[in-house]
């Protein structure tokens, strides 16, 4: 089964073609990072306009390699995300499905990120615990044997990725905050400053990062002579401590020995290092997608579309974009 996947939920325009849920035929992504850097974050209308410009170019490139008539299913993200951005990819996918007379599958963006880890690890089987951690989401999920997903914890305010972006802005490091803090923190001392770990000892599996960000703000207003590298490293350590502790606690309490980390923040080098150290110490299996599958991409959409199509779970062409879609 050949699936065409389209991803336009935020600021990456992506098109991919995947055969039988595992063989990559085409994979194109255009990032808008440089476009949004001058604004210090993603501007929804600007993102949508660039999707309108970039998506036809990527589709043309894809169809130069893959004859359109060989596509069996068209899949696209329909939420969650930015409504204008979502509509660009969703409308294009529906139009292609109609013109090619092929079935259409609407894909949940969060579920697609989870599928990225299965794409990268074909032998991986549930049950497993998944931490979805990105600029828009911080959620702890359980994936059952039937691949159904249940959210057991989530952020009550900012996502971890949002906290990285906001603290990077406070430190004058620019956008996007996750990669730049990761890079700068390598030159700093993560034990230099003690920032709070909100909700770390809370019995729930929920998160809160707004207070941590505010703590950094007050620190910068109060202190003089600090090194940006030390602040970045200490802040990053606080975020990683929270993510690692909550995730392993859920896995331990559920009796599940396999854990996956997905989403843009799953590319963070300190998170990967701390997870692997704890997994080795406590004898857990941990899984990360490769870096290129952590950030938004169309391969994960094609994979999710394949899994739904395989089960006959097609979507009506009346399906609308849902910026607040839940798992």
UniProtKB/Swiss-Prot annotation:
Substrate binds at residues 132-136, 165, 178, 182, 268. InterPro entries: ATPase_NBD, Gcp-like_dom, KAE1/TsaD, TsaD. Its cofactor is Fe(2+). GO terms for molecular function: iron ion binding; N(6)-L-threonylcarbamoyladenine synthase activity. Its main location: cytoplasm. Binds 1 Fe(2+) ion per subunit. Fe cation binds at residues 109, 113, 296. Disulfide bonds: none annotated. It is found in: Cytoplasm. CDD domains: ASKHA_NBD_TsaD_bac. GO terms for biological process: tRNA threonylcarbamoyladenosine modification. The keyword tRNA processing applies. Its EC number is 2.3.1.234. GO terms for cellular component: cytoplasm. It catalyses: L-threonylcarbamoyladenylate + adenosine(37) in tRNA = N(6)-L-threonylcarbamoyladenosine(37) in tRNA + AMP + H(+). Required for the formation of a threonylcarbamoyl group on adenosine at position 37 (t(6)A37) in tRNAs that read codons beginning with adenine. Is involved in the transfer of the threonylcarbamoyl moiety of threonylcarbamoyl-AMP (TC-AMP) to the N6 group of A37, together with TsaE and TsaB. TsaD likely plays a direct catalytic role in this reaction. Forms a hexamer composed of two TsaB, TsaD and TsaE trimers. NCBIfam families: gcp_kae1, T6A_TsaD_YgjD. This is tRNA N6-adenosine threonylcarbamoyltransferase. The gene is tsaD.
